[in-house]
Amino acid sequence: RLGLAYQLSSATRFGAAYSFRSRISDMEGDATLTAIADGIGQIPLEGKIKIRDFQMPAKLVVGASHRVTPQWMVTADVSRVFWKEVMKDIKVAFEANAGGNLNILLPQDYRDQTILALGTAYALSPEWTLRAGARFASQALRKGTLFAVIPAIPTKHLSVGFSYAV
């Protein structure tokens, strides 16, 4: 990961960061695959599962914060997540202990995603700070390609909170 921060003035800061695409080896483990046979029902098959070339995407973030008053700060950042290069397909292989292999290709066809995040913080006292934010994102998943193993990425959400300094 690479990043930089620059203080434009006593009240305004700018930052940028780039996270590189992951380089993770194939994920492997033990699994039970359940086959369903007509008239027999469920047949558990013990074996090994491998998820091939599953990677996390590169990400670029540019943001700024500005202290409007000593108590009140506003922030904004824009992110670009490069899903397209890592989430075209999910490749799964299963090798049953009793023999036999199964290779599955799960099409995902993700698009790159742009995210805008806005936030604010207000210090009620040296101890208490109120916070709020909003996030707006383009949809990375194409309609009809949502696969339950991969969580959907919310395109809009709001958050509120507080902190207490000890």
Task: Indicate where each model-derived feature is located.
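Outer-membrane beta-barrel porins/channels
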Residues: 1-166
